[in-house]
Amino acid sequence: ILTQYFGHTPKYYYDTAAMSRGLYPNMSARLKDCVVREFPSDLSKRKGEELVNAKGVRDLDPELDTQIGGYCIQDVDLTYDLFQSYITNYPCKELHLIDLTTRLFVEPKLLLDRSMLMQYKDEMVQRAQDAIEESGVEREVLSSQQKFAKHLESLGITVPTKKSPTTGKQIPAFGKNDPAYIQMCNMYPEHRALWDAREVVKSRIEETRAQRFIDSCNPDGTFGVPLRYYAAHTGRFGGTDKINLQNLPRGSTLRRALTAPAGQVLYVADLSNIEARMLAWLAKEADLLDAFAQGRDVYCEFASQIYGRTITKDNTLERYVGKTAILGLGYGMGHQKFQATLKSGSPSVDVSDSTAAQIVTQYRAMYPRIPMLWARMKDLLFNMMSPNSYGTTYGPLAVKSRALQLPNGMALSYPNLRYDAGQFLYNTSREMVRTHGPRLTENVIQALARIVITDQMLDIQSLPEVDVVMQVHDEIIAIGSEVNADVTMDKIIDIMRTPPEWCSDLPLDAEGGVSTRYDK
């Protein structure tokens, strides 16, 4: 409203909800909860409840008008008090990141191709209707777990099942990535129309997302990018406003509908396997670091170990197995989960129990310092509970009370961390969570990788040629003039290949491209 309706652009944006998520990532960021947490002894700093009195009331009487006015004033005062408390030790770079994240939404520079999305949505609706008609089964049967199971039984098909993660009981395994469901579909190819119809009915997400994109488009055709700062406790971004730009499939219509204005282009740059590189760096796994530094294909190299012959990029399936191993086994994944991951992936790869176990063993033997890192992370979990260990360091990390200080001044927090009956537990605002050495390793690596890419966002934003407009996982998207695009792209890639001071020997690599649409 302030920027797009009234035309007032603030010099700088602070966001106390975002700052709360950064300081207390496992806790609620609602103003009501924040003031209780920040000012536990000051009962005057408590959010009022007067707003409920105005629910459904269109015209406020003088008394209610005074109440709501006081409520609004108190909200502003409490928010400012929180800001004054939060700002004291909040890292400057993170404040710049909050400012940038806010501008992505309130000062949009991307355009949305509404006509493309409207046509796409209509096609999706028609495709669903055609699939349902071809299957000969009603939509309500296809969309219901219970009715679909009964329909399969009427066809003489045994319903695939899996263990419920919440109740522990056996339930129908109808997820499109459930191995038992995939196996059933492959066993009965004569019912392909039924499987296709079920997937279309249960996967209306594309249709729904297209409509949300359309609804979110501004009257001038611009599209504000809704990113949630510190959506995960590792600091990673997430979606908000019911729009998640973090999981747009490559080549999808939703992705290609995001465009640059005339005379401008999108600069899309992607950090190459940043987590695997960061893991090798923190573990001091020299062989893996050398491979990355020399630009060798680590996926092919590990696949060559698996298959006992030279694997190249031409061996797509074998390289995929090597890639899945490099990206998945670094966080303690066991052979059964690795087997299931290969089975449910694209392409789907079926390996035996013994083969999966052998690959896991090969990985841990080939890169022994990575399992050693898991053990060190277990030690750090104990250190976080021991006052005598506070202040000790491991690489760029410093031990605090139930937290690890990160090199950017933020922290990985584990509230109420404890060791009970042989397992580590901590609490979020919603649940109790179990953790262990490999899982802490994953948290640490993701947090460190996040710092690398968000610092790069700020560095790219400082370039006069471009404005950052989006960040997706390990990818940064900027917008700028089409003039001298190659030179601008080279500047962006140079930034993304330069490691920060706290890991100056980390071998980074990046690749990118230029387009008028987000189709890279």
Predicted features by range, described:
Residues 158, 224, 232, 307-464, ...:
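Conserved catalytic core of nucleic-acid polymerases
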